[in-house]
Curated annotation (Swiss-Prot):
It is an enzyme of class 5 (isomerase). GO terms for molecular function: D-lyxose ketol-isomerase activity; manganese ion binding. Belongs to the D-lyxose ketol-isomerase family. It comes from Cohnella laeviribosi. This is D-lyxose ketol-isomerase. The keyword rRNA-binding does not apply.
Amino acid sequence: MRGTEWREARDRVAEMFRKAGIALTPSELEKVEVADFGLGNLAVQGLQLVTYINTDRYCAKELALFPHQTCPEHLHPPVGGDPGKMETFRCRWGKVFLYVEGEPAASVQAAVPPGSEAYYTVFHEIVLTPGEQYTIPPGTKHWFQGGPEGAIVSEFSSTSRDEFDIFTDPKVERMPVIEFDD
């Protein structure tokens, strides 16, 4: 991802948080993580994150999704003696379509990113609007997509070890690489 794309996404996220009435410090805004997952199409498959805290006991983040932007299917595996990350998503603004293992929906409301259909395999649908939340157990495949306006989701979880996430799509690179062009 180019540095200009990262800056534009970060500025867009700042505006989303402002609209949602969620205050972030200038330092937090500078540290917004913009992940395109190495797929080169941030608007379609990507995620923006602000990590408040991540210790060996717990983690708190804000996840920002642009309209119809999808975080690719993945799971959080056991690491060492830890069973894997358990996370609760609480929608703060907009709408998020969350898909987990379980009985598939007859018709899903999200759109699987074109060309990536083979890498989206779970379709039990949970729709979250502001104030609603859902807890994802460790080791559960899941993916999620912002609604028509996008979404802001607070994540409360056990320790986050993103570098160990297992994505269904083998092309995904979890840790972002930014090429600054200035």
